[in-house]
């Protein structure tokens, strides 16, 4: 492997992880959140098993508050690529009227994402689940293994993890336990964008700069994506040139001012970026809703 480029080494590692899981687990799944990382994961999964399709389904946990363009892109990719798409919604949360505006980011994320994910994993009895998390994103993710052990309640205990030496992974689990698998652990945000550029991977158009209706709220530029977003008194809607570095539920995801309208522009922008992509995620902002706490409860 000494003649491989940096991106080729990362690609080879990720493909090895995909094949290791397919060979050792009985019922794996890939979480497909429709993010740029998910798009890279989909591309790698297709490569890993070509010309056969990936030997596992793709799961989308729908909070009912995702950007409309994300859902359109998700369905288009499933049709084009022909993979098995499972969509799960926490119906009890919907009946209870749980939402980011009425209940806040912490309750909404816990009920509609964390509990929703646990419901789906239990329903289909998956014993391994791929995710697109990377160690450079956030400090709790920086200490997580590529093969991250979860107990029967889907909880993560950072003190109860397995060593990973020489690319040898312990894939054994008892009944009810599972492993979260992160093939992109060693990638950076810049690596992701350079790989997307190199491989010409389709991504949600929201990642590219365009004029969009946004309001400035709580230090974030929130896009008005549908009529469920109620404006505060004196809060103007402005059409500004923005893009998104990260995607999630639209009321909890901040845009950034940017003129990067193509992949080359985004890579150039990333070369001078000095802030985390997750600065635009409201769910990471308060201690009560910290990422590590969410992961201990079963969040990805």
Swiss-Prot record:
Family statement: Belongs to the PAPS reductase family. CysD subfamily.
Pfam families per UniProt: PAPS_reduct (PF01507)
Keywords, sorted A to Z: ATP-binding, Nucleotide-binding, Nucleotidyltransferase, Transferase
InterPro entries for this protein: PAPS_reduct_dom, Rossmann-like_a/b/a_fold, SO4_adenylTrfase_ssu, Sulfate_adenylyltrnsfr_sub2
NCBIfam families reported in the protein's UniProt record: CysD, PRK05253.1, PRK12563.1
Residue ranges, annotated region (Disordered): 281-300
GO biological-process terms attached to the record: hydrogen sulfide biosynthetic process; sulfate assimilation
Role: With CysN forms the ATP sulfurylase (ATPS) that catalyzes the adenylation of sulfate producing adenosine 5'-phosphosulfate (APS) and diphosphate, the first enzymatic step in sulfur assimilation pathway. APS synthesis involves the formation of a high-energy phosphoric-sulfuric acid anhydride bond driven by GTP hydrolysis by CysN coupled to ATP hydrolysis by CysD.
PANTHER family per record: SULFATE ADENYLYLTRANSFERASE SUBUNIT 2
Pathway: Sulfur metabolism; hydrogen sulfide biosynthesis; sulfite from sulfate: step 1/3
Chemical reaction(s) catalysed: sulfate + ATP + H(+) = adenosine 5'-phosphosulfate + diphosphate
Protein known as: Sulfate adenylyltransferase subunit 2
Gene Ontology molecular functions: ATP binding; sulfate adenylyltransferase (ATP) activity
Phylogenetic placement of the source organism: Bacteria, Pseudomonadati, Pseudomonadota, Alphaproteobacteria, Hyphomicrobiales
EC number(s) from the headed UniProt entry: 2.7.7.4
Oligomeric form and interacting partners: Heterodimer composed of CysD, the smaller subunit, and CysN.
EC category: transferase
């Amino acid at each position: 492997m000494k003649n491989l480029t940096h991106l080729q080494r990362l690609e080879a590692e990720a493909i090895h992880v995909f094949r290791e899981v397919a060979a050792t687990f009985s019922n794996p799944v890939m979480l497909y959140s429709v993010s740029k990382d998910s798009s890279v994961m989909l591309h790698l999964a297709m490569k890993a098993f070509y010309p056969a399709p990936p030997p596992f389904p793709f799961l989308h946990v729908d909070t009912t508050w995702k950007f409309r363009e994300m859902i359109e892109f998700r369905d288009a990719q499933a049709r084009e690529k022909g993979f098995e798409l499972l969509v799960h919604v926490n119906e009890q949360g919907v009946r209870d009227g749980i939402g980011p505006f009425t209940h806040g980011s912490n309750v909404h994320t816990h009920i509609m994402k964390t509990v929703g994910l646990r419901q789906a994993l239990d329903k289909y009895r998956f014993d391994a689940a791929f995710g697109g998390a990377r160690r450079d994103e956030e400090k709790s993710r920086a200490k997580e293994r590529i093969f991250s052990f979860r107990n029967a309640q889907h909880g993560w205990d950072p003190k109860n993890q397995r060593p990973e030496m020489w690319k040898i992974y312990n894939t054994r689990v008892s009944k009810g336990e599972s492993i979260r698998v992160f093939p992109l652990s060693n990638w950076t945000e810049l690596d992701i964008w350079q790989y997307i550029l190199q491989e010409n991977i389709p991504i949600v158009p929201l990642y590219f700069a365009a004029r969009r209706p946004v309001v400035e709220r709580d230090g974030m530029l929130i896009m008005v994506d549908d009529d469920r977003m109620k404006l505060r008194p004196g809060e103007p809607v402005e059409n500004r040139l923005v893009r998104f570095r990260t995607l999630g539920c639209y009321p909890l995801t901040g845009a950034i001012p940017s003129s990067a309208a193509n992949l080359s522009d985004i890579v150039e922008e990333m070369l001078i970026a000095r802030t985390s992509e997750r600065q635009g995620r409201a769910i990471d902002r308060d201690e009560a809703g910290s990422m590590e706490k969410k992961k201990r409860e079963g969040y990805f």
